[in-house]
Amino acid sequence: MAKVSIYLNFPGNAEEAFNHYKSVFKTEFAMPVMRMKDAPPRPGMPPMSEKDANAVMHASLPILGGTLIMASDMLESMGHKTVVGNNTTISLEPDTREETDRLFRALSEGGSEIAPMSDEFWGYWGCCLDRFGIRWMFNFPKEMN
């Protein structure tokens, strides 16, 4: 079944924020928190500091009515700067890869591709900015692929 989630980016304090949200909503993480060090190494990628390696790559927490909030740390040391505008993203998980591509193309039109759709270790993923300045993330998980 297709899903919509809210994706939040933090400048290095995602875990602190999500532990707070966990206590507010009285829920548990939907899956174990993934760390930057959990990602397979990419060719040419420099080694990470211990602090960066332990930063949050992905966390997800159910809040109300089955809605998930998800998050990651966008670290300046990795070329990111978290500012109002790139700290919140609408995350779509369509039912098919074809629908994922269709939505990505339609929402990118007149806007820009932040990360083109590509096969990643967790699934088929991409991100765009629509012509109104809204960030959209697309994920078609590997188990559905």
Place the predicted regions along the sequence by residue.
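Vicinal oxygen chelate
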Residues: 2, 31-34, 60-63, 69-82, ...
